[in-house]
Structure formats: structure tokens, C-alpha cells
Design a protein with these regions (language model features):
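Glycine-rich phosphate-binding loop of ATP-grasp-fold ATP-dependent ligases
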Residues: 132-133, 153-181, 201-205, 225-242
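Conserved metal-phosphate-binding beta-hairpin within the catalytic cores
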Residues: 260-288
Length: 288
């Protein structure tokens, strides 16, 4: 093992996920002498002043035309040994527009497909790997003649690409619930309805290199951080969970990844997190 002093940049440094990644790395003796640098849009100032990074740079959004020039200046200055790209929209950018630094992300077309729940679900709709679903505009839901083909209860959430952590999510038990939720969330123009899955909440973490599965881990999310502040109870990261070793969860995740790579014609690289919820029989169904 090369124990030289390394420098690692972690993107999305102010958000919960990137900070969790850093805390995990710092628990390993392999990284005890590593210098950790972050960058972020810095909207969440707590992440700036928490102090777990050696330093943090403020960068524009990935959609900003100046993004590439700003991060290339940082890369040229810091000369990192590796970059860990965390936010989904940033992973999508780095999969399409490469940088001359060591990093590993999933392939471009795969990333474009799975960043959208609608495209992901449509790609796997002929399997039982994903829930029954439908994507609707606000006008379609508010139409007095609308009939929910999925029945109730139903899970409604923001249908835009890149949404995660239960954004705009709610368990609707009747049509009045749907209308009220649409009315409350006026900034959301498109909603996804999917069958409500009452079972366990699972994550399967699969690390690939050149098509080969290197590591795999599974966990059950039992409680979320500050769960009561979100009506869905889903706030992003867990405060309580447990590790699992379940063949069905593993096989479900790998089956979906394989099918999607066949669709895109690509070789898998990087870390893929497959989120699942158990159905009425607690059979894991992919949600993200």
C-alpha cells in the first residue's frame, strides 16, 4: 500500500453526502496523512465552517458556463491524486466532459439514463425490478376527469431529473391528497406517481472498474436524520441503519445494472448506488 501523503478533492463538499464520504475515509488508517480539499457552491455555509476539510473552494453550478474554467484552475493549483465526484449532476458532467485527473464515474449514457427516474423506470418497465408508475403534469392531475390508474395509497414525488432524498415526496391516500400536494408544491411542474412500497428501505453500493465488480455492500436505512422535518420522512442520509448480506438485494441491483448497460452499450465503471423499497411481500423494488 502506498502510504505517501495524498491529496484528494471531494466535490459537493458542503452537502451531507460528501461530508459523510470524508468522515468514512478519515476512519481508515490508509488516509491518516491525506489532505482533503473540497469544492461546492457553498449555499450551505455550515459545511464551509464545520472544519472537516483542509480547505473548501467556492465554485459555480455545473450548468454555469464558467464552471469548467473555475474547476480547472483549482485542479491545476491543487494537483490532486484523485477526485471523488459526489453530486449526481456533477457526475453526469464529468462522465461526458473528461478532466485530466484520476477519477472514476459511471459511463456517460448510463448516467444520463439513471439520473431521471422516469427514464430509469421506463427502461426497466417490462421487468418487476421497478414499481408501476406514471409521470404527469400539474394540469393532468388537476383535471376533474383524472383517474389514478395505480390506485391508492400512491407515492407522489417531484418528477424532474436529478431529484433525490425524497424531494417533493408524499404518500397520498386519496385524490384530494394528490390535489392538495400539487397545490402546495407550486414550483414543481411534473410529478411522478408510483405504487406505494411499504417494505424495508435498502441501498446496494456497487463499485466497478472496467466492467468488473470490485466491491459490494448493502445496508438497510432504518431512521433518517431529522426525519420529522419532511412529510415523507425521507431527508437524505440515515441516522440509524444496519449492514446486510442479502442475495436477493444484491442480485436485483446487479441485474438492473447489467440490463441498463446492455441498453446503453457501455462498460460499467465507478460507484453505483441502487436504492430499493420492499413491496407488500418485502421483495426489493428499485426506486433510484
Amino acid at each position: 500500500i502506498n502510504r505517501k501523503k495524498m491529496k484528494v478533492i471531494i466535490t459537493g463538499a458542503c452537502a451531507v453526502s460528501a461530508r459523510s464520504v470524508l468522515r468514512s475515509l478519515k476512519m481508515s488508517p490508509l488516509f491518516e496523512s491525506t489532505e482533503f480539499v473540497g469544492w461546492d457552491m457553498c449555499n450551505l455555509l455550515y459545511g464551509v465552517y464545520e472544519g472537516i476539510f483542509d480547505r473548501i473552494y467556492k465554485v459555480p453550478a455545473v450548468s454555469d458556463v464558467s464552471y469548467r474554467a473555475v474547476v480547472e484552475d483549482i485542479l491545476n493549483k491543487e494537483k490532486p491524486d484523485a477526485v471523488i465526484v459526489v453530486p449526481e449532476v456533477e457526475v453526469l458532467y464529468w462522465s461526458e466532459y473528461t478532466f485530466d485527473v484520476p477519477y472514476i464515474v459511471p459511463p456517460k449514457e448510463f448516467s444520463k439514463l439513471v439520473i431521471s427516474k422516469e427514464r430509469l423506470f421506463d427502461a426497466l418497465k417490462d421487468t418487476r425490478l421497478v414499481p408501476k408508475h406514471i409521470t404527469l403534469t400539474v394540469n393532468e392531475i388537476e383535471d376533474p376527469s383524472f383517474i389514478n390508474p395505480l390506485g391508492f395509497p400512491v407515492w407522489i414525488r417531484d418528477g424532474a431529473a436529478g431529484t433525490a432524498s425524497g424531494k417533493g415526496a408524499f404518500k397520498a391516500t386519496c385524490y384530494d391528497d394528490l390535489k392538495a400536494w400539487v397545490k402546495i408544491n407550486q414550483g414543481i411542474m411534473q410529478f411522478q406517481l408510483s405504487e406505494f412500497l411499504p417494505g424495508g428501505n435498502y441501498g446496494c453500493f456497487c463499485l466497478f472498474k472496467k466492467g468488473k465488480l470490485i466491491k459490494i455492500a448493502q445496508a438497510e436505512r432504518i431512521e433518517y436524520i431529522m426525519a420529522k422535518v419532511a412529510i415523507s420522512g425521507v431527508t437524505g442520509n440515515t441516522s440509524k441503519g444496519r449492514l446486510l448480506n442479502d442475495e436477493l438485494i444484491k442480485n436485483t441491483a446487479l441485474d438492473a445494472i447489467s440490463r441498463l448497460c446492455q441498453i446503453t452499450g457501455e462498460e460499467m465503471n465507478g460507484l453505483v448506488v441502487v436504492d430499493m423499497k420492499g413491496d407488500t411481500n418485502n421483495i426489493p423494488i428499485i426506486t433510484e
